[in-house]
Amino acid sequence: IMNVNQMENFVKKKKINYLLHIAGLSRPMSIHDKKFIDSIDLNIIGSANVVKVCSKFKIKLIYFSTNYVYPCKNGNYKETDSLMPINNYAWSKLGGEASVQLYKNSLILRLSMTDYPFVHKKAFKGAYSSFMYNKEISKIIPYILNERGILNIGGEKREIFKFAKKFGQNKIFPIKLKKIKNFPKDSS
């Protein structure tokens, strides 16, 4: 996503109508503090590059953002609610959203997507999310291809630790929320 010419050559060959932009820097969230330049390059500048290519070739762009762009205090957020990213990861995704918003043939998905099965050995107690597995999200995409604007997509609101215990393949150990700086308390 950093090389516009390479992306242009790819879409010319493939004759793409829709592009799902899932690329970028995501985990662990602390990497966005340590390597914030990479976060800027991939999640903001890289996303702007994707917008340029989609615009040039009139490709529908579907951008995977995060529900962490909301204040993450009370949950149950609507697309029209105020934004206040809680950490550098969320700020970088909101930066990507800014360029996508300029391109009207686009859809921004604000979601909390995770791998199936839950692969981590630790999960947060006292933090809530509306996680959906990537395979669940993939089943929704065909139904929203023609949507535009911003859509929040999420599953049932659950404590992250309980979600991990129910759907994880490993024994899950709890992490206390107060031990981690700027982790979203309720992004549902």
Annotated model-derived regions:
Residues 3-42:
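NAD(P)H-binding glycine-rich loop region in Rossmannoid oxidoreductase-like domains
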Residues 40-47, 62, 92-93:
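Short alpha-helix in the Rossmann-fold core of NAD(P)-dependent oxidoreductases
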Residues 111-118, 128-158:
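Alpha-helical substrate-binding/gating segment
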